[in-house]
């Protein structure tokens, strides 16, 4: 057939498929169908099929109104009247869907639903249309846009669907079950078993679900449980159709005869009140379809496939006069449907034609239909012409594309200034008559001006806002606040997460050095800046890295592991998750208020400056205690190499300052008590006159503190006013100072002293005072070791009060002298004797020079809640290890943002947004005083067998064989690795206005199981580590489907697994990394990240990258195993032993296919075939025909060394 005016995309079919029926010979053919019809050898060409206006439609009697072609020559498989709009939907055997609007059947939309299978059921919903094919359920908008595409099992053969409620769908077919699908989540929620297979028709009332079976039975099922309540054995052959109305059920079908199945002309009618059959109804046509059409009576419409239609009452006799003919173009009618208003009937035939019969000339498909949305016509060609002869023609009439770039008409930033309009003053009459209730004031309207009338004031006359004109607009563009004063590099940095996580986040943009930053998203990561300060103290770093003990949550051990990661990193950020995990378990930290909730940390509640100063005191005390408790552990035989002996602490030698506290009562009694402290707190003078104080004066006053207080006197035997003084006996090697700028009082003191110091500097370098000493100082500063020119600009000395060096000397009468020190003092002392003596002989005279090494500052930012950053002077040894150069340099450390800075920036404190919190001064030539040799304290004994923490763990359940002494790994050995995780905190995300999802904070994962298998030798594939990690933290989600971890597996009281501590397993992996083994696994980058390990890239063989093409998707281990190894893994849950073995086999396969990397082109072809196969299968592994649920895949290979898991 050739239909003009139809969609050009419709398929053409051969003449053999067309009907051979001659329309002229058919007495029942509607003559109106012959209008504009030409018969030719190629088929029938219909220019227009609608009924002519002369056709008369009798009210109350059904007759044909229109006939249209849905798809040329392709049989109609299903028809459905839309329940929301005035539309008729038609599906074909070719998988094509077409919709027609209104009684005129105007084509509305046409699109392909399935490329190979026929459409078997259509259901209209509020926002779209559901289409059911053989094994696919597709939800599409009425215009053809796919909303979701739900693939069923390939073995399914679906025929019917039923909308149980607005969100639940039942789908049945030729199998022995019915699926329940949630339309909100698009997931299968239930699978109901049916005793009689083959559910091809489903109906529903307020009492039952009705299921029609291919065996000829109709079952009535409960609405809640879907259990069979009643069953009617309607036909002995098969069921053709049935319908339900009120208390009646009518069915038609086929009965078994000697020659086979024959159409039964008796309709079976059942009374649902008595649940029994009533008198069958004999009809005069061969019934294939039937529907109740309850208008005035409960009429039944019975349709035969040849086109005959009969109306009759279900409880009366059929009248032959009620038969009429539909006149299909093809030989058979294929579908039949009735509109919700009962005013229209739709028939679809085998030639793709749709016939609409109505009982009125202007029928309505639904009692209440909403308005249909039509595509807007293109308005581009209908734009009005512009008359260029008009002088006042606005250029805004010309449409231009929206752009975010700067426009030519934009004013330059230098010529722009924010000019806020001041609120007008409140009328004096209003203030006089105002009454207040609480904080709300109200007054009668004085009627002095009109509503919304405000006097306009020019900018020149508003002198009160002149200061704003001095603030230039932010140079970075319109998006930033123009009055924001915090420098960009000091602002709180955040990680932008995408659907790939961190893989596409550019950390190099924030850190162009080879030093490692720290990630900020972990709970209580506010201490990142202090971790960096401790790391860049060379003696502290060596001491911590040499420490190892048996204590599970030892901060010194965890800090040493973190320092090792910072050593290995080449600019990539690290995370202190394991250190902070141990930190959260210490009761003292919680008692001091150092453990912040996520909400408090995100909102910046509390003072971060006070918090980090308390943390500073806590960490030094805790490290001092951990070092004092050091004993040679039995489990870790390599832990004996420590700096200090038992009972002493190198932390004490570095930080501790011996003090002498003297209490003098007014009775003359004096009490002296010795003590020590690890840090000092600045105590500021109460002077409000604006007097100039050197930092050295304030520091001396804070160290040698003198105060009056009430104290107990043994002589007086009562509390008496006493004078308490503190004298120093021994100076520390590292001087730690908490600034305690916690109020505006201390901030004003810093601001005032900085202003006074700046005035002195301007006078000094401005030429008013120029002595020989200053000249020497200038020349010395020009050759400073940091490589910066001193005072190249006066701006560098603004807000500077802190000296870069101080000199301290013990006096003979237990006193202390402190002064600000600059290198010019040493030059002047060469020619003139000084009370301090030459610096080169400082130890002989008890004189020490301290150089500023780090400053920790609190950044005040109301938009982000503030943050903590550190300025650190990185020494030569660190530059030598990282960059191969020998020099010193100041750096800004702001989490993962690291940037070199000028040395003066480290001591500039604008108290409006940059407040000092902690200062670190170190003795000059500190590194030469200590042994800085560091060695790895982890030995091979950590891999030997160890006891499990689980009380119920039995040896028969062992899933691994520990390494023997002759199996110890060597450099380059292969080890298969896999890890499973649980979730501690759920992901925090927000939904943007455009519908996209933005991750604010990723989910916090914790390692739950780590497995290592042998990669070579006779025992290849047998695990030697299979540790379940005990956790004391609250687990939100065990992720059992993906991890195989069940509740109780990580609890030492009830677990039957081999349970260990995270530290124990971490040491095993650290030893393997340090010895130089190569790890083989799938997705190892995430595994090492959660375990908190830094592994050199040449020791990682990740199959997710080995079998990956650039700019293509990553392929799952399950699909790779099925494609290359013909293995089906990860059936119900994941098993780490199975995954690790599979990764090893895939690596062997990679070496085989790529000829050990020698033939990359041939391997590239293999990868192309892999991706083509994956796209065809939608990256899903076909399920086996009979899949048994795996009870335990964690055991050893049967027969391997006689072990069976």
From Swiss-Prot:
Q: Where is this region: Linker?
A: 368-484
Exonuclease domain mapped to chain residues: 975-1147
Q: Which residues form the USP domain?
A: 485-924
Keywords assigned by UniProt, alphabetized: Cytoplasm, Exonuclease, Hydrolase, Metal-binding, mRNA processing, Nuclease, Nucleus, Phosphoprotein, Repeat, WD repeat
Main localization is cytoplasm
Record-listed a divalent metal cation binding positions:
978, 980, 1087, 1139
- Named cofactor requirement(s): a divalent metal cation
User: Per the record, where are the segments of Low complexity compositional bias?
Assistant: 1184-1193
**What catalytic reaction does the record list?**
Exonucleolytic cleavage of poly(A) to 5'-AMP
Q: What is this protein called?
A: PAN2-PAN3 deadenylation complex catalytic subunit Pan2
Q: In which organism is this protein found?
A: Rattus norvegicus
């Amino acid at each position: 057939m050739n239909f003009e005016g139809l969609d050009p995309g419709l398929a053409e079919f051969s003449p053999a498929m067309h009907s051979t029926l001659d329309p002229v010979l058919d007495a029942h053919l509607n003559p109106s169908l012959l209008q504009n019809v030409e018969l030719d050898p190629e088929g029938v060409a219909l220019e227009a099929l609608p009924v002519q206006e002369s056709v008369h439609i009798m009210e109350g009697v059904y007759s044909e109104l229109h006939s249209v072609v849905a798809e040329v020559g392709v049989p109609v498989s299903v028809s459905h009247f839309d329940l929301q709009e005035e539309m008729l939907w038609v599906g074909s055997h070719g998988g094509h869907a077409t919709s027609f609007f209104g009684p005129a059947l105007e084509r509305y939309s046409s699109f392909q639903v399935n490329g190979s299978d026929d459409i078997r059921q259509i259901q209209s919903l509020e926002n779209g249309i559901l289409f059911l094919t053989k094994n696919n359920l597709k939800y599409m908008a009425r215009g053809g846009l796919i909303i979701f595409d739900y693939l069923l099992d390939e073995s399914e053969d679906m025929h019917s669907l039923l909308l149980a409620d607005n969100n639940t769908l039942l789908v049945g077919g030729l199998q022995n079950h019915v699926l329940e699908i949630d339309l909100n989540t698009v997931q299968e929620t239930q699978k109901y078993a049916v005793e009689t297979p083959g559910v091809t028709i489903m109906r529903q009332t307020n009492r039952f679900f009705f299921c029609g079976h291919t065996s000829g039975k109709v079952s009535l099922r409960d609405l809640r449980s879907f259990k069979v309540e009643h069953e009617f054995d309607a036909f002995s052959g098969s069921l053709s159709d049935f319908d339900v109305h009120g208390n009646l059920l009518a069915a038609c079908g086929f009965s078994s005869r000697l020659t086979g199945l024959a159409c039964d002309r008796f309709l079976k009618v059942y009374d649902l009140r008595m649940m029994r059959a009533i008198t069958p109804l004999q009809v005069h046509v061969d019934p294939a379809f039937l529907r109740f059409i309850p208008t005035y009576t409960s009429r039944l419409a019975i349709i035969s496939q040849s086109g005959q239609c009969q109306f009759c009452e279900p409880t009366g006799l059929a009248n032959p006069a009620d038969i009429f003919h539909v006149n299909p173009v093809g030989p058979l009618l294929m579908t039949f449907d009735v509109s919700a208003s009962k005013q229209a009937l739709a028939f679809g035939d085998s030639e793709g034609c749709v016939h609409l019969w109505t009982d009125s000339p202007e029928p309505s498909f639904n009692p209440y239909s909403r308005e249909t949305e039509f595509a807007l016509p293109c308005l581009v060609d209908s734009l009005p012409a512009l008359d260029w002869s008009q002088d006042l023609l606005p250029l805004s009439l010309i449409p231009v594309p929206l752009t975010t770039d700067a426009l030519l008409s934009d004013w330059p930033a230098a010529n722009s200034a924010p000019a806020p309009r001041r609120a007008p003053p409140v009328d004096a009459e209003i203030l006089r008559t105002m009454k207040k209730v609480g904080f709300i004031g109200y007054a009668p309207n004085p009627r002095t001006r009109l509503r919304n009338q405000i006097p306009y004031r020019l900018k020149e006359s508003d002198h009160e806002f002149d200061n704003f004109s001095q603030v230039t607009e932010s140079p970075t563009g319109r998006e930033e606040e123009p009055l924001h004063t915090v420098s960009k590099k000091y602002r709180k940095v955040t990680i932008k997460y995408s659907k790939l996580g961190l893989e596409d986040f550019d950390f190099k943009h924030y850190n162009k050095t080879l030093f490692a930053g720290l990630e900020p998203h972990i709970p209580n990561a506010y201490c990142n800046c202090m971790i960096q300060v401790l790391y860049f103290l060379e003696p502290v770093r060596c001491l911590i890295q040499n420490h190892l003990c048996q204590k599970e949550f030892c901060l010194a051990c965890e800090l040493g592991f973190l320092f090792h990661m910072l050593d290995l990193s080449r600019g990539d950020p690290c995370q202190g998750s394991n250190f902070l995990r141990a930190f959260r378990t210490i009761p003292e930290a919680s008692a001091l208020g150092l453990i912040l909730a996520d909400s408090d940390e995100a909102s910046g509640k509390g003072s971060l400056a006070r918090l980090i100063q308390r943390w500073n005191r806590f960490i030094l005390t805790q490290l001092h205690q951990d070092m004092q408790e050091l004993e040679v552990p039995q489990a870790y035989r390599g832990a004996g190499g420590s700096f200090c002996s038992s009972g002493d602490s190198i932390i004490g030698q570095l930080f501790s300052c011996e003090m002498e506290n003297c209490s003098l009562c007014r009775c003359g009694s004096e009490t002296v008590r010795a003590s020590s402290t690890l840090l000092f707190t600045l105590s500021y003078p109460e002077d409000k006159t604006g007097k100039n104080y050197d930092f050295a004066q304030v520091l001396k006053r804070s160290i040698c503190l003198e105060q009056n207080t009430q104290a107990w006197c043994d002589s007086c035997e009562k509390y008496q006013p006493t004078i308490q003084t503190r004298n120093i006996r021994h100076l520390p090697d590292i001087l730690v100072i908490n600034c305690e700028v916690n109020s505006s009082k201390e901030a004003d003191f810093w601001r005032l002293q900085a202003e006074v110091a700046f005035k002195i500097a301007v006078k000094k370098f401005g030429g008013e005072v120029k002595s020989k000493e200053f000249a020497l100082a200038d020349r010395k500063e020009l050759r400073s070791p940091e490589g910066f020119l001193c005072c190249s600009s006066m701006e560098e000395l603004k807000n500077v009060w802190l000296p870069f060096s101080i000199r301290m000397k013990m006096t003979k009468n237990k006193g202390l002298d402190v002064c600000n020190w600059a290198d010019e003092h040493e030059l002047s002392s060469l020619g003139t004797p000084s009370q301090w003596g030459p610096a080169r002989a400082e130890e002989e005279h008890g004189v020490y020079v301290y150089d500023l090494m780090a400053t920790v500052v609190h950044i005040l930012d109301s938009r982000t809640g503030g943050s903590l950053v550190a300025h650190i002077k990185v020494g030569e040894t660190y530059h030598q290890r990282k960059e191969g150069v020998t020099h010193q340099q100041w750096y800004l450390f702001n989490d993962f943002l690291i940037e070199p800075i000028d040395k003066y920036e480290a001591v500039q404190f604008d108290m409006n947004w940059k407040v000092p919190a902690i200062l670190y001064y170190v003795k000059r030539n500190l590194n030469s005083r200590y042994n800085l040799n560091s060695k790895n304290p982890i030995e091979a004994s950590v891999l030997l067998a160890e006891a499990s923490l689980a009380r119920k763990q039995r040896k028969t359940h062992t899933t691994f064989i520990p390494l023997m002494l002759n199996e110890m790994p060597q450099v380059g050995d292969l080890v298969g690795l896999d890890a499973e995780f649980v979730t501690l905190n759920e992901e925090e995300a927000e939904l943007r206005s455009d519908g996209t999802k933005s991750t604010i904070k990723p989910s916090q994962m914790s390692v739950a199981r780590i497995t290592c298998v042998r990669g070579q030798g006779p025992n290849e594939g047998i695990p030697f580590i299979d540790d379940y990690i005990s956790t004391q933290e609250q687990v939100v989600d065990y992720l059992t489907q993906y991890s195989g971890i069940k509740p109780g597996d990580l609890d030492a009281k009830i677990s039957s697994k081999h349970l260990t501590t995270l530290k124990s397993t971490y040491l095993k992996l650290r030893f393997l990394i340090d010895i130089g083994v190569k790890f083989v696994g799938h997705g190892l980058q995430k595994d090492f990240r959660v375990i908190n390990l830094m592994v050199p890239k040449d020791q990682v063989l990740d199959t997710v990258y080995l079998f990956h093409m650039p700019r293509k998707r990553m392929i799952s281990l399950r699909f790779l195993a099925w494609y290359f190894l013909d293995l089906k893994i990860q059936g119900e849950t994941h098993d780490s032993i199975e995954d690790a073995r599979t990764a090893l086999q895939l690596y062997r396969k990679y070496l085989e296919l790529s000829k050990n990397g020698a033939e990359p082109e041939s391997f590239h072809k293999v990868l192309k075939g892999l991706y083509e196969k994956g796209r065809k299968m939608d990256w899903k592994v076909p399920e086996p025909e009979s899949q048994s649920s795996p009870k335990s895949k964690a055991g050893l290979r049967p027969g391997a060394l006689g072990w069976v898991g």
